[in-house]
Structure formats: structure tokens, C-alpha cells
Amino acid sequence: MNFHLHINRGAGAFVCGEGSALTASIEGNRGMPRVKPPRTVEQGLWGKPTVLNNVETYANVPKIILQGADWFHTIGTEGSPGTKTFSLTGSIENTGLIEVPMGTSLRHIIYDIGGGLKSGAAFKGVQIGGPSGGCLIDDQIDHPPVSYT
């Protein structure tokens, strides 16, 4: 399979992670979200239907093409197949980028993979989802598990 790929570097504004803001930025306009509908799959880049996904989604495509959708659905949970990447940072023993099956609890990620908190410090909370995410306290890191729902 051959295809042409063009990578266009954006201005780096957080808001440009939103699909319509990203297309506006690529078109040379201010990267601001637009009112929907239409969605970018109907009218996106230069007014044409546009598929936009994050790098995590695109990273799964070759594995699914090579091994099939049935294989992909064996990873994770029935309602949330596949994997999720996390960047472990802060006061944790083992920092770095990890990939876990959907359905993995944050407690498992923090303590079993991340090695727990440095110096045995008491857990106060964890921020998930980047700047637009939220914070969870100890009694919230088992449920809900990592999922799409």
C-alpha cells in the first residue's frame, strides 16, 4: 500500500486538540472550535469529510490490520477493547510511558506498575486526563476502571 502523508505542525495551542479547531489551524485560521453540527467527518478540512483521531488510535491501526479485529477484541474488556497509554509522572517510583489493557484499575497502574509512591508517602490523589481531566482520591482509583464508558 502506498499513500502520500503530509504532517502539518500546528501552533501547539491546547484548544487545537479539538477536531474543528485543529482543522481551522491547518487551514491557516485561528484554532478555535466551531459550533456543531456539522462534525468534521461531514465537513472538515477545506470543507471535505475529514477523519481525525489521536495518535493512540492511529497506533492501533497496523496491529488491527495485521492481526484482525477479533484479536483486538481479546484485549481489554467487552465494552472497551484495546489498550490505553499513560504517562506516569510525579511522586511515583517508576515514571515513564506505559500501555495497559482497557479495564486496568488505576490502583494497579500506580502501585503494581508504577511501584507506588516515593518514600512510602500517603496517597492523596491522582490527576487523569491532562489539563481537561480531573482528580481522583484513594477510594476512587479502583472504580471505574480504565474504559471508554
Feature names for model-found ranges:
Residues D70, D112, D138-D142:
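Acidic-enriched, low-complexity/disordered segments with a strong bias for Aspartate over Glutamate
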Residues M1-M102, G114:
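Hydrophobic alpha-helical positions that pack around
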Residues K118-V126, G130-V146:
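Terminal amphipathic helices with adjacent charged low-complexity linkers/tails
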Residues G103-K118:
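Short amphipathic, charge-patterned alpha-helical segments
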Residues T149:
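Conserved small/polar residues in nucleotide/adenosyl-binding loops
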